[in-house]
Design a protein with these regions (language model features):
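A post-motif C-terminal structural segment
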Residues: 53-63, 76-82, 92-97, 102-139, ...
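N-terminal low-complexity, Pro/Thr/Ser-rich intrinsically disordered segments
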Residues: 34-80
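Bacterial N-terminal signal peptides that target proteins for export
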Residues: 3-15
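Bacterial signal peptide processing site
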Residues: 29-32
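C-terminal motif of bacterial Sec signal peptides marking the signal peptidase cleavage site
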Residues: 24-27
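His/Cys-centered metal/cofactor-coordination and adjacent catalytic loops
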Residues: 154-165
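Glycine-rich phosphate/pyrophosphate-binding loops
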Residues: 172-173, 177-197
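N-terminal amphipathic, basic-rich helices that act as targeting or association modules
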Residues: 83-91, 176
């Protein structure tokens, strides 16, 4: 707890300016989240934000128990950090967070980790039209990821290049050039847009390997004098820790360059990568560095979703409510939380590190009109954030940032109703039911992104930079500034 005018108060998930302006906001915590309930002594705040009691009584649904002005001001820390952990929920905006909270933790509950971040705001996510150079109001993951990773707006589909096709350096590349350790973790294929934007520069996001690159990104192909496919550039970028899916692309064969005629798996081995294919093998890794970087690939494509499908249908809202269940296909797949913890353990060092972590299938389940798959991957996101926060609280020199890359289609609507779209009704933690609508397509698998601004929240040194309305390009600048990086260093 923090004392304000003689009263104990909790902090808010919001922010204030350093000088005189306090900006009201809201945050939460969890009594059983492993982060403790005695208060965050590193930041001088108690990140706890659940309903006060019986939500049917006056004041029972309150998440605040006093004036927050001083508590918020006290949560602002120094502006330099040794480490930055950027956690992305792909396709995760406020509707997706609310759906997960309502289902898994209850309407008056809290999302562990995510709702515990003391400072927050929203950022704009628009892309650019490749031809007109004017705003494209609904972004994809390639353009959005390029924005935060390089500080440059671009067209949908572009990975690490501007609207004219010119390569833009990423935070990971700059951090590595400045002597920091680097990591890239995802639940998707490592070649997918969000992980790719930190390590590659191609005209089209589907240029995973040499085969696709020659077909879709001709000038980027090694055979045509370009930098190569996303996977080839990933290997050349040489992050200290790289964990995710996408093994099938590593079976493609290079068609030019030093490794011509060899598979990308063989290339990785010859470049000195430690390759692991299971959680058990990952547990055995003790070090990862530039002499022996770690490449963990745990699925042929995307990692399986934690929870089984419950696809929405035309009449799903009227059908009996569904309770989500574990996905049998997940099996022994490493969870995002364990991948995050392992990456942090391998990256922590005296000089500092930059780590990007993505829960990528919130988006993919949203495209599929699959609320249970979507919520399960938001639970994975929550667990990863809790792990990052636990480290940051102990380290006291780590900035944790959590955001989505774009808004998506899922909506909570009137319970039991149907729409012109696809719906599904779920049983919730509260013992009630809610109905989810997917209204941008009648075909599961074809649901579309939407163009709303997206929440961004943070904890640690420099966290106040997320406050208010910012743009998706802003994180590139304040992350590199907080880390004290020379953006011109090669």
């Amino acid at each position: 707890m923090t004392t304000f005018e003689g009263k104990k108060v909790r902090t808010a998930l919001a922010a204030s300016t350093v000088a005189a302006v306090a900006i009201v906001a809201a945050a939460c915590g969890n009594k059983s989240d492993g982060l403790g309930t005695s208060g965050d002594t590193a930041a001088g705040v108690d990140i706890k934000r659940e309903a006060a009691g019986d939500i049917t009584t006056n004041g029972g649904a309150r998440r605040l128990d006093g004036d927050q002005t001083k508590a918020i001001a006290d949560s602002i820390q120094k502006s330099k950090a040794k480490n930055v952990i950027l956690v992305i929920g792909d396709g995760t905006a406020n509707q997706e967070l609310t759906l997960a909270r309502d289902y898994q933790w209850g309407a008056g509950g809290q999302i562990p980790g995510i709702d515990q971040l003391p400072l927050s705001g929203d950022y704009t996510t628009y892309a650019l039209n490749k031809d007109t150079k004017k705003p494209d109001y609904t972004t994809d993951s390639a353009a959005s990821g390029t924005a935060w990773s390089t500080g440059t707006k671009t067209y949908n589909g572009a990975v690490g290049v501007d609207v004219n096709g010119k390569a833009q350096r990423s935070i990971l590349e700059i951090a590595k050039a400045n002597g920091r350790k680097t990591g890239n973790v995802t639940t998707t294929e490592l070649q997918d847009a969000t992980p790719a934007v930190q390590v590659a520069h191609v005209a089209q996001r589907k240029c995973y390997g040499p085969v696709e690159t020659k077909e879709k990104c001709g000038s980027d192909s090694l055979a045509n004098g370009g930098p190569g496919s996303i996977t080839e550039q990933l290997l050349a970028a040489r992050a200290d820790v790289t964990l995710g899916g996408g093994w099938k692309t590593f079976q493609q064969t290079a068609d030019a360059g030093e490794y011509n005629g060899k598979t990308l798996e063989v290339q990785a081995k010859e470049r000195g990568y430690q390759i692991v294919r299971s959680g058990e093998e990952l547990d055995g890794i003790k070090d990862a560095n530039q002499d022996k970087p770690l490449l963990g690939v745990f699925a042929e494509g995307n990692l399986p979703r934690l929870w089984d499908k419950a696809t929405a249908t035309k009449e799903g809202g009227k059908e009996p409510a569904v309770t989500c269940s574990p996905n049998p296909a997940f099996g022994a797949t490493p969870k995002l939380q364990s991948l995050t913890k392992k990456a942090i353990d391998l990256l922590k060092n005296d000089k500092g590190f930059f780590l990007q972590v993505e829960s990528g299938s919130v988006d993919k389940a949203n495209h599929d009109a699959d609320p249970c798959g979507q919520i399960g991957e938001t639970v994975q996101l929550s667990d990863a954030v809790s792990t990052a926060l636990e480290f940051a609280k102990q380290d006291k020199d780590t900035l944790v940032i959590v955001t989505g890359d774009h808004a998506h289609t899922s909506q909570i609507i009137e319970t039991g109703s149907v729409t012109p779209g696809l719906t599904r009704t779920l049983n919730t933690k509260d013992g009630s039911t809610l109905t989810v609508n997917y209204g941008t397509s009648l075909d599961p698998g074809e649901e579309q992104h939407t163009g709303g601004q997206v929440r961004i929240a943070a904890y640690g040194p420099g966290a106040a930079n997320v406050v208010g309305v910012t743009d998706q390009t802003d994180p590139f600048f304040y992350i590199t500034d907080v880390l004290g990086l020379d953006r011109t260093k090669k």
